[in-house]
């Protein structure tokens, strides 16, 4: 209050590059979205989004990502981005009855999954192949920088295991104990050599939390390697070779890749390399050249400077 338009504009411009501002100001309803887009959404689109909201479908899009849209209708083709933000009639119709798109992602206590793997209780570890398993932490990594309409884990948003209520996703005290148990699964398996930390989105975890997760992975890799030194030839376990972080934030929220995060990635690479890990990868999902902005390019440069690779 009391600020001129120019003063407000300068203040928002100063906040724009802070990922916390972007998350705090994210659009969460159809009416907010239409207002942000200057009332450019059709009545059919608004009806569909309102129907989705009534069915409990979450909506979440940051000002940064929405700024990539063309609201004039006379500029460039932004259909690729709109397809990520706006839900299809088919998705809205089936929401509430969605099951796991991959049968292997169905985890039942005490029973092997469809790929034959017996997994720890809960929904933290998923596995389809002998050499790789997915880790989904009980942290803010169960959220995303936006909800992709094509998300393969839409059933997890449906069950609210994944959501955008950030305060409820902050790790509880018991998470540290649970993380140790989950690391035991990787350590005691003879074939696993690749861990993919995802969600949600791996980079949505707070820096302190992500550091703790990576340090737990590093300690596990070291223990597994030392145990192997005591095993005879022919009985050695696969050692951890690759660590991947699944994240769309370089496209959705590139300002999340700040200096502190880069230092965490660099420190982990140095420590994990000493215990035999050879590949460090951010696995992202750029879907259109419209997402390759100056901010995204800077985020990629920072990640590469930490010695990590980018795959898309």
Please identify what each model-predicted range represents:
Residues 1-129:
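Flexible, acidic/Gly-rich N-terminal and inter-domain linker regions that tether
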Residues 46-50, 195-199, 285:
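Glycine- and acidic
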Residues 61, 118-156:
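N-terminal pre-triad scaffold of radical SAM enzymes
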Residues 129-133, 147, 189-198, 243-246:
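Glycine-rich, often proline-containing surface loops adjacent to acidic residues and nearby aromatics
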Residues 141-144, 158, 202-204, 289:
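Short strand->helix junction
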Residues 143, 154-195, 212-215, 219-223:
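Conserved alpha-helical substructure of the radical SAM core
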Residues 146-150, 159-163, 294-296:
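A short secondary-structure junction signal
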Residues 179-187, 200-312:
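Conserved AdoMet/S-adenosylmethionine-binding subsite of the radical SAM
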């Amino acid at each position: 209050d009391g600020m001129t338009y120019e003063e407000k504009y300068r203040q928002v411009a100063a906040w724009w590059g802070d990922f916390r501002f972007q998350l705090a100001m994210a659009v969460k309803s159809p009416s907010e979205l239409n207002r942000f887009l200057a009332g450019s959404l059709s009545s059919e689109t608004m009806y569909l989004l309102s129907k989705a909201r009534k069915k409990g479908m979450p909506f979440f899009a940051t000002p940064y990502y929405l700024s990539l849209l063309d609201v004039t209708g006379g500029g460039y083709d932004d259909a690729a981005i709109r397809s990520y933000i706006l839900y299809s009639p088919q998705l809205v119709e089936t929401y509430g009855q969605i099951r796991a798109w991959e049968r292997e992602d169905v985890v039942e206590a005490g029973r092997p999954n469809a790929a034959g793997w017996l997994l720890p209780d809960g929904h933290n570890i998923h596995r389809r192949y002998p050499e790789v398993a997915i880790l989904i932490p009980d942290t803010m990594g169960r959220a995303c920088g936006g909800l992709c309409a094509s998300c393969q884990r839409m059933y997890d948003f449906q069950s609210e295991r994944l959501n955008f209520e950030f305060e409820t996703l902050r790790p509880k005290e018991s998470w540290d104990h649970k993380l140790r148990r989950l690391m035991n699964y990787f350590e005691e398996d003879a074939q696993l050599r690749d861990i993919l930390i995802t969600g949600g989105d791996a980079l949505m975890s707070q820096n302190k939390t992500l550091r703790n997760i990576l340090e737990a992975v590093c300690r596990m890799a070291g223990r597994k390697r030392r145990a192997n030194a005591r095993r005879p030839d022919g009985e050695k376990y696969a050692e951890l070779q690759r660590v991947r972080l699944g994240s769309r934030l370089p496209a959705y929220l590139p300002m999340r890749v700040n200096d502190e995060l880069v230092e965490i990635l660099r420190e982990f690479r140095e420590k994990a390399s000493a215990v035999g890990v050879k590949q460090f990868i951010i696995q992202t999902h750029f879907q259109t050249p419209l997402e390759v902005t100056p901010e995204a390019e800077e985020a990629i440069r920072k990640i590469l400077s930490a010695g990590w690779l980018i795959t898309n």
